[in-house]
Regions:
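Anionic, Ser/Thr-rich low-complexity intrinsically disordered regions
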Residues: 12, 43-52, 58-60, 64-71, ...
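Acidic, PIN/NYN-like endoribonuclease modules and their adjacent C-terminal/linker elements
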Residues: 1-5, 19-29, 109-151
Length: 151
């Protein structure tokens, strides 16, 4: 299996800081941390964007902001704002998604990422042929079914 690319939105980056007493949140956190280990171990290439950077920049919690910024250093590429990104985001917004969510998706599509990871239910309902959208747990199931290994 060739190296694949992954894009995580800010909901995913912040998941480990959410209330872990809730089962869904705890499972998604464990899966998200596993995805991070795949990136750190160079099994997946991380792509992020100016939207990730912006949302993290305005995060009022310094400890979260710092941890997420540190992980961005693992990225192979950062998608910057462009006419095409804005235009695609406008199309996505017409399908009912919020502007920042649409920008995340548009950036991922622009970078031709293989996998978009989110814990946002509205994004998970969005359908496109341009990339695969997963929550962290479903991504791990998919990754393993495709022969992905962490060793």
């Amino acid at each position: 299996m060739g190296k694949k690319t992954v894009y995580l939105d800010n909901c995913s980056y912040n998941r480990p800081f959410d209330d872990q007493r809730q089962l869904r949140i705890s499972l998604e956190t464990q899966a998200k941390l596993y995805i991070q280990s795949l990136v750190r171990n160079e099994k997946l290439d991380l792509i992020y964007s100016y939207v990730c950077f912006y949302e993290n920049y305005i995060n009022p919690f310094e400890n979260k902001k710092l941890a997420i910024s540190e992980f961005f250093k693992n990225a192979k590429y950062c998608v910057i704002e462009s006419h095409n990104v804005i235009q695609k985001a406008s199309e996505i917004i017409k399908n009912g998604l919020q502007p920042l969510d649409a920008l995340h998706l548009s950036c991922a599509i622009s970078a031709k990422v293989d996998y978009f990871i989110t814990v946002d239910d509205d994004i998970l309902k969005y359908s496109t042929d341009e990339l695969q959208i997963f929550d962290p747990v479903m991504f791990i199931k998919h990754w393993e079914s495709m022969g992905g290994k962490d060793d």
